[in-house]
Amino acid sequence: RLTVMNENVESAINQIGVQLSSRYDMLAAALNQAKDYDVCMACNLIAKVNFHRCVITSVSTTGEVMEQEKMIQSVLEELEKMVRQHPEINENKDYSKFMEAVDSYGRMLQTSTLIYNDSVTKFNRAVCMIPAKLIAGIMGFQQCSYLENIRCK
């Protein structure tokens, strides 16, 4: 039972990794569209994304997940400033399509975070109960940490 619950937690964080990766891909595509309006700033943001991006897997920590989302939020804020300087960017249909996808993956990420936290709650409860607590110790299972609620723009 503990093994299945642990697999559920790992599966949930893997799903978060997929959502983050897709969110990064769509953000990069939007930035490529924005290059037509402000090459320097768009290239700097693309470089920032490429430098800080990392893959989230079942062995990733909640801190790593939060760092990745904070990074995306930071780039989105800078991109928003660029759009204020060049409002015609919003008229680019491809840019708008990619930004809608960034938002959509953000909502999916929020849902995946809720699923992850629910899986962690069930697992942590099971790990604390006797006799499972004894078995968990022998098998090397420890309580998992929760993810903060991700608020995507």
What residue ranges belong to the model's regions?
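A helix-centric hydrophobic-segment signal that preferentially recognizes long
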Residues: 1-153
